[in-house]
């Protein structure tokens, strides 16, 4: 949570900040005569606590929000983002032979008659060759086997995880924050994430039942819509991606057609349009707070369970921020720091005014008697006389 509010992503950075800040020492109950925990201690404590404990912390914060009427839970939105893993692409090896990527490229060069290439020649050959594909079925990272080869939004390829938020569209509270493999399609994880959100609402004793679920067109899949329509109480509001041809339902179950058409009608309605506007605003805001200013865009841990633990606490810290904004009108990452800076600036301004006043009226060398305004003095005297 300190990492979220201070905008620090690494364990070493968090440990250093706890050691350096007097206010954080006071908050954590660490006297100046004692050393604060180092990054190794933080890692050991996190590893010893199971992920269920971290989920209990998350639901405990949800319970606090519910006490302040900050959890509605009826209308939610779902979206995902990629978290860059703590592993480089050069750490990948083939699953079948165990060869690293450089040796694999050298074998391709040998087939074309190029022997004993230098590292620069290998890099140039790999950059120029056509149909270059690296799949998770054939390659795995030795540094973090659970990280997936993922194409990022900027077109680059990295080892990554996928973080998915389920957000209350009425209060901006995160109801679930789940970590999945980076190569999982959005439609694969939609129902699981919403079910996690409902479980969290139940464990937080909110009494809320999720009814409406909004997502972007990346979540649209016929099979997923059909499954959710058949065995869940959720109504989906998911726009359809543009297709080159009209959908054909010949030979397909009637349930699929009914589910797709019902979702289409809801999306085109006024409520559907409003939910899409709210989704693009509220869900993206949670990612901006947690991943960008909160320091969670790149994970410094390895293994899905460790990443899940850290991300649950970051999402819980975001929800504490929602509560703080309700109570104190501040609660974003670095928000308290800005408040302190503003307070210090105001105090400094008051101090400068005090010094100026002191020099003007107390210091004899700078004392300058002001001329008497007789008309103003006479008017003041007349007003006192009239009052008497």
Spans of features found by a protein language model:
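Anion-binding and metal-coordination hotspots
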Residues: 7-20, 30-388
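Short amphipathic alpha-helical interface patches used for protein-protein assembly/oligomerization
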Residues: 24-28
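Short, amphipathic alpha-helical "recognition" segments used to contact nucleic acids or chromatin
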Residues: 1-5
